[in-house]
Structure formats: structure tokens, C-alpha cells
């Protein structure tokens, strides 16, 4: 009996102990798996290079150079060692030099290069060796005349010269820029200790990284040069003039008809006699006048008009894109990573072992690296002004036909007709009549003769003077620093929620240039969500370029709308040479600085470049409208463009290109977050889903906790989990995230989903409940004091933001959008379906994504139990053992 009882007791104890060793899966993240952390330590260092475009200077003329002050002991600006004396030229010279100017010569300044004259009152200038607290005051009449230009010192100004000449100018600029050298240093450290630790231990890790290096990139942008050339082009204009001359000549025509008749009379007498008569008749007939038309060709005259001056012609010559090469050599740097592990207590069966705290110092020396930056500048637009030579135009007129009508007077035509002699036989006698002549005169009326003469064409020579003006405009891009914070303005009170970058709807932020910006002329990407403009920097939204649409599958030129921020083309794998500028005026001397920490960031993931037109159009539309309710309407242009941008990028996301949420969601987050604050209309809402912010509770959906390794970042604090003396250090950039909560997401493969959003208010806190309906999984998610939504396919337009369905995790995409207690500016990269971040760090995992939907068991963490609840068989065995114990006890 005792043996049976002991066996049953042992079996029950084993089952209970096996169930008790199973770890509870906390909804806050993978801290519950503290008993089974990975057994290695990995340290990551990200090196990212940035670049500055340099352009070669053109021919310049130095028109003003401020000379250094005399060496009289004054070695610092604005404060001579001795008190200045009123009217002293020496001290005025020092004073002007300290102001970055030069002393006026004869009270005048050069009138070139923007140099202006100002008078400075010498007041309150302390004598350095006097110790006076009041200083030396002078009357307003004690002034110094200084010739100043912004910046002071020696200034080089490009003077625009115009000259007239006949020439053909071909300009070609070739520049080579090499950019982005990424160097990754991996320092694997493995500490093995055959000890099993039951309790998780949080190890604060401090990674001191000091890189006191500042890289200054000089960029010089030169003014345009206008060359006017007068070209005289001879032009020959051929003209043909037809002259018709009508001559009327009256030609009288006389027709004389003469009739000659011979009459022979035959008289018959008693004796038959033969009489022969011959008649000759002459008839004169006057015919009417006739009109004769004669065509005469007369050679055309040559007309030479005066010279004609044609208006100037402007030819625009677009030069091909140029490439600039810049090589920056960085010195070697040493990075020391110190991980301090506190004392830990190890509990084993029967014994308690307390391990002292350990400190691991990892020193890594990064050798000097050479960063070659390649940028392709957009082709320069060259406009050449030239005056062509006088043009001589010879105009040859066609042959002219001159019709001359000549009217002839009436003519007299004489017709003589001779009749043969006739014989008349009379009986008895023969009488012969001599021949007679009859003259008939006819007078014809006057006739008109028309003659048409065709003259040959004549040549007219016209000399035309053409003035062709070609303007060569050389434009270079000088990148401005990223707008993260405004050093010149801080609002006194919180701004309304519909203010974007400190400006109300309908207005756009245009930051003023600061000395730190130098003479930059192009903003790199959109400002940070925390950037605030002062009220005087808010301007009405300027007009934009007409809508632009690229040919599908091609990358073309993108015309920049002045005053608007454009998405960084490098996020699309493009360069700045896609930009085209209309009516640009180049500035002089671009200068900005980049810290070395920015150079050590890895380049961001990119999306397909052919989607830039749709995405940038959505950004400029949002900038023009602002945070206004009309922007958030489902049929608004902004929502349509965002949907097209997201569809284009997600359809092309593969191993080479990333998706919308990973790269572009932070660009649109500020406007989408504003739309989320508007009242929710009744019924389903159709909107694009460009981003995600959700918090879900435990559900039947199972997920595998893995870690995205797509980007490596750096942080000054992290949380490690320790098992068998295996220290894990995960470093996350503090600029990317400042959260301490765990983040996990599971992407949904549902092609379409319907989200119904309701708000529930309780006495303790505000709760949003989202009830998703999809074809793959049915989950109920609830978030407390955070935004909650259910994710769907990128093409779904039912909700504003895509979300993820996770098991007991909190997922924030793009820094949380201001919800909850976490804040971030960048997106949280995900990989293999789920991204998990714990305590600001990143722990590499071995998960392979979401298990098939047919899976019924939870995916176990390596070395951990599946769940806290005992299995069915365990319950049965425990129940039987308990009953046996009870019977044995009785």
C-alpha cells in the first residue's frame, strides 16, 4: 500500500512539475521566454555615407576683398584692446573688419556684386584691459562707414557679361559622383556556461560611442551667364510680278471690190449674127474694223526692298546630365561596447548558486575608410543668344503677261471681179459690146487689237538682321540639411491638431535659411513631423505644376513645383537628376555640414522608382490642401493618389524593392493621423490603407516571434536576456524608436476585409474595439488608449491604415503616430511576417513566419513550453493521482 501510494505520488508530482515548468506567454512580448534566450551575443554597427554635390566654378571676377586689420593688438571681433577714439580710421577699420566688412574708401563702396554701405554706431565697445562694466559710449555722430556683404571676408562674385558675336556654342559637362560605401563590422561574442537559469534577468547595457568628427562639404553654385550674339543672315526673297498692258489700236479696213465685165451683145438680124459681150465689174466693199490680240512677254522688274530686321530668336540647349565624383577619406575610429551584467541568482534542485555580475568590454577598431560619393546632376540648360548676319532675300517674280489691245481703223478692200464675155446672138446682126469695169468700194469699221505681253519674274533682295539670344543657365543642386527641428522658433503653446509643420490648412511651411544651412537650394525630402515653422514662415500654398503622369514602366523627368517639398528620390533608388527646373536662378556658394554619425547610417530600403510620380503627387497634394476634412474624403484626390502609390509600390515589392508601409508610410503619417481623428461615418468606410497602428489581445491566431534583420541600428540602451551565461546585446537607434514596449505584427493575406469601428467609453479609460471580418482568420482585437485596426491587402480600401493580427503583442508602425506612450519617426521594418522589438533592442530569432492556418498547436519558442495550461492527458493523470493520494491518505 505504501509503495503504491509512493508511485502515484511521484507520478502526480512529475506531471505537476512538468506543467509548472511551462512558461506563461505574456501578451507584452517575449519576456516570458526568459528561461530560454538565444545563446549568443551579436553587436551591430551601421555605416552610412552621405554626399555633397560640388560643381566646378566658372570664370569669376573678384570685385571686393576686405583687407585684414592692422596688427595693432586687436585679435578678436568687435573689441579692440584699447578703447576706440571717435573718428579714428584705424579703429573703424578694425570695427568694419570685425563685422565682416571693409572700411569705405572716400565714403563710397563698389556698386557690384550686391555690396552695400552701412554705418555702424560705435557704442558700448568695452576696452579689454580697462575692466569697465559700462563700456565707452559715443554719440550717434561717431560712426564708421563700412562696405559690407553677407559673410564678410574675401568674396568672389560672378559677373554676368553680355557680348555680341556670331558663333555656335556647344557645352558639355561630365561629372562623376560615387556615393554610398557601407561597411559593417560584426563582433560575435559567445559566452557558454552550463547553467540553467529559471528567472529572466534584465541586463542594462551601455554602449558609449564617441565619434567627434564633423565633415564639411563645400558646394559652389555659380550664377548664370547670358551671352547675346547678333547674327546677320542674308535672306533672298524671290517675287514675280505680272504686268498686263492693253494697247487699243483702231485699224480701219478698206475692202475694194472691182468687177470687170465683158458684155457681148449679139443682135440677130435677118442674117444670123453672133454677138459676144464681155463684162468686167469692180466692187469696193468696206468691212468693219477687226481686233487683233497679241501676247507679248515683258521681263519682270527686280525689286530690292529695304533690309528687314527679324526679332531675336532664343534657342534652348539642354546639356546631358553630369556626374561629379567626390572621395572622402574618414579616419579610423574605435568603438568600445561595454556590457555590464548584474549579479544573478541560479536556483537548482537542492542548491542555490549566486553568480557575481560580469562586465564584457568589446573594443572594435574600424579602419579608415574611403567613401566615394557618386551623384548625377541634372543636365544643365544652356540658352545661347546670338545675332545672325543680315539675311538677303532675293524675290524673283514670275513672268508677267501684258495684254495689249490694238484697235485698227476701218480698211478699204477692193475686189475686182472679171466676168467672162457673153455672146448674144440676134437675128440678122451681131453686136459686140466692149468689156466694162465696175468698182465697188466697201468701208469697214475700226477694229481693236489686244496684245498680252508676259514679262519675266523680277528678283527682290531683302537683307534681314537676326539677333539670336542664347542664355546659358548652369544650375547645380545644393542639398539642405534635413528639417528635423527649427533652431530659431519654438511655439509657446501646443498647436492645433490640423497644423502641419506649424502652419494651418491652406498654407505651406517655407523655412528661412540659417547660417547652418549655408546657401543650399534644394530640400532633401519632407521635414520631420516634429518640425515647426514660425508664423512668418507660413505662406499661402503656391501654385503647382500641372499634373504629371509618367509612361507606365518608365522613369522620366519630374518638373519641380517651387515652394513644395518633394519626397527624397533616393527612397525610390533614383538620383536627383530626375528633377527638371523651370525658370530657375542659380544661387552662389552652397554650403552645409553633415555629422559623421549621419555617414554611418545604412541607406534606407527602396521602393520601385517608376512609382515616384504617383507618390510625390500625393505628397504635394497633401501639402497644398493641409490637414483639412476635405483631404480625408474617400473620393478626394489625396486618397486616390495615396491608394495608387501604395498599389504601385506593393505590386512591385520583392527581394529588390520594399513595400509602402516600410519605406513611405512615415511620409504621409501626419496627414493620415489627422484623418483618424475625424468622426467615423456610419457604416463601412472605404479608404486606402497606407499605414498601420494597432494593439491586439490574445486570439486563436498563432504567430511565430521572429526578428527583422533588414536594418541594423544603434542605441545607447538595450535589454538583454540571459541564459546559461549567454549575453545578448541588441542595439536599436534612438532616433528611430524610443519605445520600451514589445512590438509584434502578423501580416494578413486576406485580399479584402471589412472593418467596423465602434467606440466604447468606460469610467476608467477609453477603449476602441475593432471587429475585423476576413476570409483567413477571425480575431477580436481591443486596444486601450491606442488606435486599433485590422489589416488587409494593400489594395483594400476599407480602412485608413493596414493593421496586423498578432497574438498578445503591441504593434506600432511608423512611430505609433502619436498614440499611446511611444513615439517614433521612422517605420518599424518587418521581415518574414512579424517584427518584434523588446526594450528598445532587437533579438535575432529563428522563426520562419506564420504557421499554416490548419495548425492547431502554438508554435513554441526555442526551448520553451507551448502554453501555461496543462495538456488534456496531464489533467487526467493529475486527477487520477489526486484521487489515489486521497484514497491512500484515507
UniProtKB/Swiss-Prot annotation:
Residues 680-872 are annotated as: Disordered. Residues 865-890 form a propeptide. Glycans are attached at residues 106, 217, 583, 654. A lipid is attached at residue 864 (GPI-anchor amidated glycine). It is a lipid-anchor; GPI-anchor. The keyword Chloroplast does not apply. Residues 693-753, 760-790, 803-812, 821-837 have a biased composition (Low complexity). Keywords: Cell adhesion, Cell membrane, Cell wall, Glycoprotein, GPI-anchor, Lipoprotein, Membrane, Secreted, Signal. It is found in: Secreted; Cell membrane; Secreted, Cell wall. It comes from the Eukaryota. Residues 838-848 have a biased composition (Gly residues). Residues 791-802 have a biased composition (Polar residues). The GPI-anchor is attached to the protein in the endoplasmic reticulum and serves to target the protein to the cell surface. There, the glucosamine-inositol phospholipid moiety is cleaved off and the GPI-modified mannoprotein is covalently attached via its lipidless GPI glycan remnant to the 1,6-beta-glucan of the outer cell wall layer. Residues 1-20 form the signal peptide. GO terms for cellular component: extracellular region; plasma membrane; side of membrane. GO terms for biological process: cell adhesion. Belongs to the ALS family. Cell surface adhesion protein which mediates cell agglutination and host tissue adherence. This is Agglutinin-like protein ARB_02240. It comes from Arthroderma benhamiae (strain ATCC MYA-4681 / CBS 112371) (Trichophyton mentagrophytes). The lineage of its organism: Eukaryota, Fungi, Dikarya, Ascomycota, Pezizomycotina.
Amino acid at each position: 500500500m505504501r509503495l503504491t501510494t509512493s508511485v502515484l505520488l511521484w507520478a502526480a508530482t512529475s506531471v505537476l512539475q512538468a506543467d509548472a515548468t511551462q512558461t506563461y506567454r505574456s501578451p507584452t512580448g517575449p519576456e516570458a521566454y526568459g528561461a530560454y534566450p538565444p545563446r549568443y551575443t551579436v553587436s551591430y554597427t551601421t555605416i552610412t555615407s552621405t554626399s555633397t554635390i560640388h560643381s566646378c566654378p566658372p570664370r569669376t571676377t573678384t570685385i571686393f576683398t576686405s583687407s585684414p586689420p592692422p596688427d595693432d593688438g586687436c585679435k578678436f571681433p568687435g573689441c579692440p584692446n584699447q578703447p576706440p577714439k571717435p573718428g579714428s580710421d584705424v579703429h573703424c577699420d578694425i570695427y568694419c573688419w570685425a563685422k565682416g566688412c571693409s572700411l569705405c574708401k572716400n565714403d563710397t563702396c563698389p556698386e557690384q556684386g550686391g555690396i552695400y554701405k552701412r554705418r555702424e554706431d560705435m557704442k558700448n565697445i568695452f576696452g579689454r584691459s580697462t575692466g569697465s562694466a559700462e563700456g565707452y559710449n559715443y554719440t550717434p555722430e561717431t560712426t564708421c562707414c563700412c562696405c559690407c556683404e553677407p559673410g564678410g571676408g574675401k568674396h568672389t562674385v560672378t559677373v554676368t557679361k553680355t557680348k555680341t558675336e556670331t558663333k555656335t556654342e556647344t557645352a558639355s559637362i561630365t561629372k562623376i559622383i560615387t556615393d554610398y560605401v557601407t561597411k559593417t563590422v560584426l563582433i560575435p561574442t559567445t559566452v557558454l556556461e552550463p547553467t540553467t537559469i529559471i528567472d529572466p534577468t534584465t541586463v542594462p547595457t551601455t554602449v558609449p560611442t564617441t565619434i567627434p568628427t564633423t565633415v564639411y562639404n563645400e558646394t559652389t553654385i555659380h550664377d548664370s551667364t547670358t551671352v547675346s550674339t547678333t547674327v546677320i543672315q542674308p535672306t533672298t526673297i524671290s517675287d514675280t510680278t505680272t504686268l498686263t498692258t492693253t494697247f487699243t489700236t483702231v485699224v480701219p479696213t478698206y475692202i475694194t471690190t472691182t468687177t470687170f465685165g465683158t458684155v457681148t451683145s449679139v443682135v440677130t438680124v435677118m442674117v444670123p449674127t453672133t454677138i459676144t459681150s464681155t463684162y468686167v465689174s469692180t466692187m469696193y466693199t468696206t468691212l468693219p474694223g477687226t481686233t487683233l490680240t497679241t501676247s507679248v512677254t515683258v521681263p519682270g522688274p527686280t525689286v530690292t526692298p529695304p533690309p528687314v530686321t527679324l526679332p531675336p530668336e532664343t534657342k534652348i540647349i539642354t546639356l546631358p546630365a553630369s556626374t561629379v565624383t567626390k572621395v572622402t577619406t574618414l579616419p579610423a575610429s574605435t568603438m568600445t561596447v561595454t556590457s555590464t551584467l548584474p549579479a544573478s541568482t541560479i536556483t537548482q534542485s537542492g542548491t542555490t548558486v549566486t553568480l557575481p555580475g560580469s562586465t564584457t568590454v568589446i573594443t572594435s577598431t574600424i579602419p579608415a575608410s574611403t567613401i566615394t560619393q557618386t551623384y548625377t546632376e541634372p543636365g544643365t540648360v544652356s540658352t545661347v543668344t546670338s545675332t545672325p548676319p543680315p539675311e538677303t532675300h532675293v524675290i524673283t517674280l514670275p513672268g508677267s503677261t501684258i495684254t495689249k489691245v490694238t484697235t485698227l481703223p476701218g480698211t478699204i478692200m477692193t475686189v475686182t471681179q472679171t466676168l467672162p464675155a457673153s455672146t448674144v446672138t440676134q437675128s440678122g446682126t451681131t453686136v459686140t459690146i466692149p468689156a466694162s469695169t465696175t468698182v465697188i468700194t466697201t468701208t469697214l469699221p475700226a477694229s481693236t487689237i489686244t496684245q498680252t505681253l508676259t514679262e519675266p519674274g523680277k528678283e527682290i533682295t531683302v537683307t534681314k538682321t537676326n539677333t539670336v539670344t542664347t542664355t546659358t543657365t548652369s544650375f547645380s543642386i545644393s542639398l539642405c540639411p534635413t528639417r528635423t527641428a527649427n533652431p530659431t522658433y519654438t511655439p509657446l503653446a501646443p498647436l492645433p491638431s490640423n497644423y502641419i509643420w506649424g502652419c494651418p490648412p491652406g498654407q505651406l511651411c517655407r523655412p528661412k535659411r540659417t547660417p547652418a544651412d549655408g546657401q543650399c537650394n534644394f530640400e532633401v525630402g519632407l521635414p520631420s513631423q516634429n518640425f515647426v515653422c514660425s508664423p512668418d514662415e507660413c505662406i499661402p500654398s503656391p501654385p503647382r505644376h500641372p499634373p504629371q503622369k509618367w509612361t507606365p514602366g518608365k522613369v522620366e523627368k519630374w518638373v519641380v513645383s517651387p515652394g513644395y517639398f518633394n519626397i527624397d528620390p533616393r527612397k525610390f533608388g533614383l538620383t536627383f537628376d530626375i528633377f527638371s527646373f523651370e525658370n530657375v536662378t542659380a544661387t552662389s556658394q552652397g554650403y552645409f555640414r553633415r555629422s559623421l554619425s549621419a555617414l554611418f547610417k545604412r541607406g534606407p530600403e527602396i521602393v520601385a522608382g517608376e512609382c515616384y510620380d504617383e507618390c510625390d503627387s500625393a505628397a504635394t497634394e497633401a501639402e497644398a490642401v493641409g490637414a483639412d476634412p476635405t483631404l480625408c474624403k474617400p473620393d478626394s484626390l489625396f486618397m486616390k493618389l495615396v491608394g495608387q502609390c501604395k498599389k504601385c509600390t506593393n505590386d512591385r515589392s520583392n527581394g529588390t524593392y520594399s513595400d509602402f508601409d516600410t519605406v513611405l508610410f512615415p511620409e504621409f503619417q501626419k496627414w493620415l493621423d489627422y484623418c483618424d481623428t475625424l468622426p467615423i461615418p456610419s457604416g463601412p468606410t472605404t479608404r486606402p490603407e497606407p499605414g498601420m497602428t494597432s494593439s491586439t489581445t490574445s486570439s486563436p491566431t498563432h504567430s511565430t516571434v521572429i526578428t527583422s534583420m533588414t536594418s541594423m541600428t544603434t542605441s545607447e540602451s538595450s535589454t538583454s536576456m540571459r541564459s546559461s551565461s549567454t549575453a545578448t546585446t541588441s542595439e536599436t537607434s534612438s532616433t528611430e524608436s524610443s519605445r520600451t514596449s514589445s512590438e509584434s505584427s502578423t501580416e494578413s493575406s486576406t485580399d479584402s476585409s471589412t472593418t467596423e469601428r465602434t467606440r466604447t467609453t468606460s469610467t476608467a479609460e477609453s477603449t476602441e474595439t475593432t471587429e475585423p471580418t476576413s476570409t483567413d482568420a477571425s480575431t477580436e482585437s481591443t486596444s486601450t488608449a491606442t488606435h486599433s485596426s485590422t489589416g488587409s491587402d494593400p489594395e483594400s480600401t476599407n480602412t485608413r491604415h493596414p493593421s496586423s493580427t498578432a497574438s498578445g503583442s503591441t504593434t506600432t508602425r511608423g512611430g505609433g503616430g502619436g498614440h499611446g506612450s511611444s513615439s517614433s519617426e521612422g517605420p518599424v521594418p518587418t521581415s518574414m511576417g512579424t517584427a518584434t522589438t523588446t526594450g528598445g533592442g532587437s533579438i535575432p530569432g529563428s522563426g520562419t513566419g506564420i504557421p499554416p492556418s490548419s495548425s492547431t498547436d502554438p508554435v513554441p519558442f526555442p526551448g520553451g513550453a507551448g502554453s501555461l495550461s496543462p495538456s488534456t492527458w496531464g489533467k487526467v493523470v493529475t486527477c487520477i493521482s489526486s484521487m489515489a493520494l486521497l484514497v491512500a491518505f484515507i
